[in-house]
Amino acid sequence: MGEPGGAEAAVSARLLELAADDNAAGLGELLAAWPSLADEPAPWYTPARGAEPLTPLMVAAVYGSVGCLDALLSPPYLVDPNRASASSLSTPLHLAAAGGSASAPAAVSRLLAAGADPALLDHLQRRASDLVALPPNSLPLKNHLLSLLGARKEWPPDPSLPDIKNGAYASDDFRMYSFKVRACSRAYSHDWTECPFVHPGENARRRDPRKYHYSCVPCPEFKKGAGCRRGDMCEYAHGVFESWLHPAQYRTRLCKDGVGCARRVCFFAHTPDELRPLYVSTGSAVPSPRGALEMAAAAAAMGMGLSSPGSSSFTPPLSPSAGGGGGGGGGSGGGGAWPQQPSVPALCLPGSAGNLHLSRLRTSLSARDMAVDELLAAAAAAADYDGLVASPASIRSARGKALVPSNLDELFSAELAAAAASRSPRYADQGGAAFSPTRKATVLNQFQLQQQHSLLSPRAAAVTPEPVSPMSSRLLAALAQREKMQQQTLRSMSSRDLGNAASLLVGSPVSSSMSKWGFPSGNPDWGADDEELGRLKRCSSFELRSGAANGNHEPDLSWVNTLVKEPTPEKMMTTTSAMDSIGILGQNTSRDHIVGGEDDTAGVISSWLEQLQLDEMVV
């Protein structure tokens, strides 16, 4: 590590000596071996300044070494002529004017031709023209030097340079987002003030407002001249170019000179038509995020479509000067050598509404997109379905929960229990007709047709509907499953009375409690005592239990007495076998419920009722 650093220091010191002696040949040979040291400073001692780190170009300017200046300012080195010393902020132009060399005017001419800025100030706020030091007998030479430093350099017309006052380079988008932001690609010396691109060491350099989110307010630290400690990450503008070319402030005020303005790049509008809109909420040409959100909400409420998802509400309108001249001065045909710059995207500041996904406003199906007849049909279907439910209080409590298989027993038992309370033993009420398979199929078909009609309607054709919610899909599946269960139960019944009892058992709490059948002691007991047989004899049909529970009058059961007789020992064995089958069936039902087979509950009940009916017929 020490040897390479010492070698570079020795080479840098040797370069300074060659530049002071104006040895252009030796300087070129050494730079060919060490090209990276062409613009590297090294300590140099002068009687007036003492030891100060200077570059080879600065030393050549002090001693008026014109040959070395030409070598350093030409390709392939292209040393920056505006680089300032770290200690005194002196540029090569300051050193050439204060050097007192006889060839100082030639050195100053070389530096000005390379783009040196005579308006730069040193640490004492002095220009290069303030440091001219020549003997008294060299008054003509001094006047010539002052004329070079005081007068603005007039460059010959360069057709390759774009016209910054006309064409695409004078448009609002280019001025706000590209002027003095993009690096210049020219390898030869030219007038920086006529070039719209940034150069190394140029004071007009700007940060890209699309990359660095800063405001148009000037930075208080940068204005003091000491530089900002935050650098490019500062939230304030550094310099007049960043402040006045900011999209929030550019051309929001009228120029005091009007159409007679002679500035090459003016930050103000020259006619009222060139003024960019100023938003009162922010005091600038950029709307506030709250205003943008309110505008987007208003557009959505009015049914206004957005042009594209990527369009930003911050895009300011282009001024009329975007396509034509922005002032005087003829165009110089720069468009042929320089291609047109692509359109710059709109500014997207933090928290802007442009970052929001506004496409969701177009994909939500609301009542605005449905016709009046569709709304009436949907409301009628909802009211019809609510009218089918017998117990509104219990169903409202069930709707508040997720529709899962564990809630189906609760949901359907509440419906059927309320319906059974108002029925006669022979289906005297009309509530059963509302729960008939034909009625439920009609309601489901009407609901599906309404959904298809709403999707195919002209107003909803341009809107992408959201997927059906899980609640509605589960409700439809539950209704279809319940219809299937009732159809299977009704097909398996052989009498109207048993059908009534089965319809009550499917959704009643008895069905949910069947899964808990078992033996309290844990050991199976397949025997039957006299009390159980007597209870079986007295309760030969489920309708008797239903009627007794509801307080209804007992119907005529004379036809049952003809079938029921006193049991004999042989028939006792038959009854015991029937009870064995019932116990095994209860175990299977409990096992199916544990595994998750609630869908087969209706089939289990129907098989159990058929077996019971056959046993009664045998008895």
UniProtKB/Swiss-Prot annotation:
Signal peptide: none annotated. The keyword Cytoplasm does not apply. One of its GO terms (biological process) is regulation of gene expression. Residues 322-337 have a biased composition (Gly residues). A zinc finger (C3H1-type) spans 213-241, 249-273. ANK repeats lie at residues 52-81, 88-120. Transmembrane segments: none annotated. Keywords: ANK repeat, DNA-binding, Metal-binding, Repeat, Zinc, Zinc-finger. One of its GO terms (molecular function) is zinc ion binding. Residues 308-341 are annotated as: Disordered. SMART domains: ZnF_C3H1. The keyword Metal-binding applies. InterPro entries: Ankyrin_rpt, Ankyrin_rpt-contain_sf, Unkempt-like, Znf_CCCH. It comes from the Eukaryota. This is Zinc finger CCCH domain-containing protein 67. It comes from Oryza sativa subsp. japonica (Rice).
